[in-house]
Amino acid sequence: WLKNHKEPLPSGVIAMSPWTDLTISGESVETNFEKDPLFGKTRDSMLYNKDYLGDNDPTNEYISPLFGDYEGFPPLLIQVGSYEMLLSDSTRVAKKAKEAGGKVKLSIYEGMFHVFQMAMLLMPESKKAWAEIKRFLHYLDTEENEMQNISKEEKA
């Protein structure tokens, strides 16, 4: 919306386990159905849910960002778990943004589930994800580092 209405864009975007395709067309919706402890149990409501969509087109870019234009998009950090039904949403948005010339860091956390980052101090993967977010914010603030350096862990 901001870009389409010529409003200033944020310096960067952090997307944690984003749901970017409400057409539910991603391969991982099926392949990760039994692995995803959060969305797996609600798959049918995802597939047939009209509460959110109403009569709106699920390919509308404001509803499903996957279908948006990523040219001129700010740097993007996407974090997603490998067990998420929404994994394909993240990989496809990352690909689309890169193809549009954007700076994108896609981090797939092995064995993790939807919004695993919210476990904060309970899991090492969550701690690692928050440290990556900190490095991304530093990158946005200084622009001294390359995007690929965001995943490098700090030395203790």
Feature-to-residue mapping (PLM):
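Alpha/beta-hydrolase superfamily serine-hydrolase fold, recognizing
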Residues: 1-156
